[in-house]
């Protein structure tokens, strides 16, 4: 499929730094690629492949700049399932290097990295290829139990706990999660524990609105419908499913269930839009429809006894209208006429909230699902014939079995506040590699966990800067350590030391015990003032930041005393592995504040470098009377 590559553009670029960009495509496919080549004086005989299932082939400046600064050329291929297009692009790149470099080594070192859906591709590449990539950095690892099950349990818990969100958030910010427990009913506490045992990080609930987002669950609906089309019908009709259960949990979840038949009141053709064909207004939709999520619209035949098909479009609950897209089948568009009936329901969406209960993996070791196995060893709930998450993973990774038989060195970067890719899933994959490699494990594998980091690659939103850090520098650090490991035999820092309790990954406390690459920060205040801080009193904040052995030096310390998410840099001397500071501050206004210090370590101890900077946050709540 990817046998013939064609170069379309070959040009010199100046930004983010001088390089050569080669753009091309594979003949007979819709897959294209870009190579970003550093000048010969900067190339060190290696390349990086960045992968993600639905990316385009144009790399962002930060990614290009990092590769160039690391002595590598960057390959970015438009997104596909699996790794084959990326492998073909890598092989093609070798064939043209002599056109750009006078000296090309016999072996060009290759490294592949990608996160979330890209971790499927990265692991697939390392289990199913040899001789293309020498190492890999999978980031925020997805496994054969991740999608869509993580989102199902997360949305179940957030739907039940929504009315207690403020109690949960406050207890986490105060550093005492147990404070929230007395405020939860028996049902709420049970669902909270179900989510915890499934792997939702407890402290991630501080960003409750993020966990409550149903966007991904709705995106993943179509995959489950294709793989397990009878699930929703079974949910609402068969014993053992919440849809037929008479319980408080059923009452809470199903209070958000909608199933009505509406009438098309008006149809307005849209002639000046590339995406939408009609705007249709519905009659007979309840006034509170704005409160219902995951709605689907099915056009019914005459007499409502048959279905013509599902409509796609954009729903506007305030006007009770649908902007119908042009990509709907002609039979649907031609039947959008006044007085025709449309069924409005979210039965599939509601049913998805407990899908994880019916998906106990057939493979051993996925301990987050043990809660759904009874004392007799049998599943508590009916199990589906298809294991949807395993099928999703199989397609995304290019058919790999997640057996751990990696063909090169690997450093996994995983985040402890990740509610999309649960932290314990990386621990599970580590066990697969360890079992398969045996005595070769320590020479080929690392797992680095990072606290105060979430899932997405985008810059941290302003309202979350006191909660999480940007972790781009963490996997940049991993990529550089991987290069040194493969090419020069320099051992990277040891894997993070941690324990798993109730599916929660808990790292060791001290830097010399925790290992990994993230600096640890301890923040406290003078004990004599705790609980008795008066306005105008000077508070001394005591901070210690420690970089793990071999992980670089602390190069920056920034403070936010008032919880305004605005950090001010504070000089502390030369970069060092350990930084101790006592910083005074006066609070003039009574209130509750979250004082936050952000520390940054850089792999080479270079305070001026923008790359391979690893951050962490120290936080303490301050009550001023």
Q: Can you describe what each PLM-predicted range is?
A:
Residues 1-625:
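C-terminal His-loop and adjacent cap/lid subdomain of alpha/beta-hydrolase
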């Amino acid at each position: 499929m990817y046998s013939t590559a064609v170069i379309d553009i070959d040009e010199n670029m100046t930004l983010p730094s001088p390089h050569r960009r080669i753009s091309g495509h594979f003949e007979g496919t819709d897959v294209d690629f870009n190579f970003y080549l550093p000048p010969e004086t900067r190339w060190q005989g290696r390349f990086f492949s960045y992968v993600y299932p639905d990316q385009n082939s144009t790399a962002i400046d930060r990614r290009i700049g990092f590769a160039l600064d690391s002595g590598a050329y960057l390959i970015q291929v438009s997104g596909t399932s699996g790794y084959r297009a990326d492998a073909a692009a890598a092989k093609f790149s070798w064939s043209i290097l002599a056109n750009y470099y006078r000296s090309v080594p016999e072996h060009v070192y290759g490294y592949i990295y990608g996160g979330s859906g890209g971790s499927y591709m990265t692991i697939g590449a390392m289990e199913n290829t040899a001789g293309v990539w020498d190492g890999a950095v999978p980031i925020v690892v997805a496994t054969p139990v991740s999608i869509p099950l993580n989102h199902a349990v997360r949305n179940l818990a957030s739907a039940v706990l929504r009315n207690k969100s403020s109690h949960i958030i406050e207890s986490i910010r105060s550093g005492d999660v147990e404070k929230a427990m007395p405020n939860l009913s028996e049902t709420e506490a049970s669902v909270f524990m179900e989510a915890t045992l499934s792997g939702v990080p407890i402290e991630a609930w501080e960003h409750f609105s993020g966990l409550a987002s149903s966007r991904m669950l709705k995106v993943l609906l179509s995959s489950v419908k294709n793989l397990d089309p009878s699930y929703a019908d079974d949910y609402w009709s068969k014993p053992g499913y919440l849809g037929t259960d008479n319980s408080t949990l059923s009452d809470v979840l199903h209070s958000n269930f909608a199933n009505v038949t509406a009438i098309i009141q008006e149809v307005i053709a849209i002639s000046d839009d590339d995406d939408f064909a009609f705007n249709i207004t519905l009659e007979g939709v309840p006034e509170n429809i704005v409160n219902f999520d995951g709605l689907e619209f099915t056009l019914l035949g005459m007499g409502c006894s048959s279905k013509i098909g599902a409509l796609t479009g954009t729903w506007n609950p305030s006007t009770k209208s649908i902007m119908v897209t042009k990509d709907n089948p002609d039979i649907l568009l031609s039947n959008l006429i006044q007085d025709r009936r449309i069924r409005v329901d979210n039965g599939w969406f509601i049913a998805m909230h407990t899908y994880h209960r019916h998906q106990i993996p057939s493979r051993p070791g996925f301990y987050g699902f043990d809660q759904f196995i009874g004392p007799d060893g049998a599943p508590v709930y009916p199990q589906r014939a298809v294991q949807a998450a395993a099928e999703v993973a199989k397609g995304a990774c290019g058919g790999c079995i997640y057996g751990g038989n990696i063909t090169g060195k690997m450093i996994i970067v995983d985040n402890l506040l990740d509610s999309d890719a649960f932290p314990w899933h990386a621990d599970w994959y580590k066990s697969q590699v360890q079992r398969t490699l045996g005595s070769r494990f320590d020479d080929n594998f690392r797992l680095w966990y990072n606290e105060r980091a979430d899932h997405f690659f985008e810059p941290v939103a302003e309202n979350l800067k006191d909660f999480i850090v940007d972790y781009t520098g963490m996997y940049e650090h991993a990529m550089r350590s991987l290069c040194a490991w493969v090419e020069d035999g320099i051992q990277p820092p040891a894997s993070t030391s941690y324990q798993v309790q109730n599916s929660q990954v808990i790292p060791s406390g001290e830097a010399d015990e925790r290992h990994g690459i993230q600096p640890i920060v301890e923040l406290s205040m003078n004990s004599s003032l705790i609980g008795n801080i008066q306005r105008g009193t000077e508070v001394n904040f005591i901070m210690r930041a420690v970089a793990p052995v071999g992980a670089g030096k602390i190069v920056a310390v920034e403070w936010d005393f008032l919880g305004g998410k605005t950090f001010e840099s504070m000089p502390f001397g030369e970069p060092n592995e350990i930084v101790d500071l006592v910083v005074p501050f006066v609070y003039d206004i009574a209130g509750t504040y979250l004082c936050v210090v952000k520390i940054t370590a850089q792999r080479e101890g270079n305070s001026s470098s923008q790359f391979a900077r690893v951050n962490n946050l120290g936080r303490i709540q301050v009550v001023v009377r």
